[in-house]
Amino acid sequence: MKKIFTKSIITTLVCSMLVLTAAGCSNGTNAESSSSTPTETQATQAQTTAPEEVNFSLDALHAPLENPADPFAGYWRIAEGAGSKLESFTFLFNGKGGASIIVGNMGYCGKYSVGTDESTGEETFKCQLMFGINGEYSYTVAEDGKKITITNNGEDSVLEKVDNPTFVPSAPEKPQIDEKLVGAWDSGTGLYYYFGEDGRMYCNSYGTTFTYFTYNTKLNKVTAVYDMDGEQTDTYDYTFDGNDLVFDGMKYTQITPEKMLSAIQSY
């Protein structure tokens, strides 16, 4: 029964993405509640210090920033209470206003903010995700920072910190790779691909979703494997037009991995 429930949630997640392409993994300062009113409280985003320049790392591409002013920064799961049926999903709060719900190797992006209710002085947490955590909450943080209880309309959800999330796949053994593909590619319209020489691949679609894969190439085809509540396999045709890549019918220009990282972090 739990498996059927989870699959229905995932199906709805995929369908919902068709109408949420404008949401993005934003650094915006406010996450709107699903139903706002004129008396809605105002949250101010916790300030972070400017991040240091970092080298590109596929494993750390979506790693959250350390932010002492933001107790939500990190990876979490719903351990108890409302939404606990989604306990296999990982929730990522990146320390600068970007939220993601991660299913297997796929992430679906939204926004969040932490602040203070101007009328009551109560600490508030706003989050805009499709499932599990969506709305405006009061919250309390455990002494060790490993659990946060969020409350909305009298319903509690207990978030438990995840120290070692596993949504990035391990590199496959002896992958068959076309060396011309290796590197980062930009469509110029918000689609980014990265092909690693270790047989791992990454896609970011308009800042609304991201997916990690393992892949092989043969006869101008990429076979990409990823997990979303079970193993999925996609096949893509590709060719080259001069220095440009034509992948699945769309043209891409090669950029540095660091430039792709900068673009993704700007959402």
Which residues are covered by each model-predicted region?
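Bacterial lipoprotein signal-peptidase II cleavage site
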Residues: A23-S35
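Short, exposed beta-strand-loop hairpins at the edges of beta-sheets
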Residues: K146-V158, D241-T253
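Short, low-complexity, Pro/Ser/Thr/Gly-rich segments in the mature regions of secreted, periplasmic
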Residues: E258-Y267
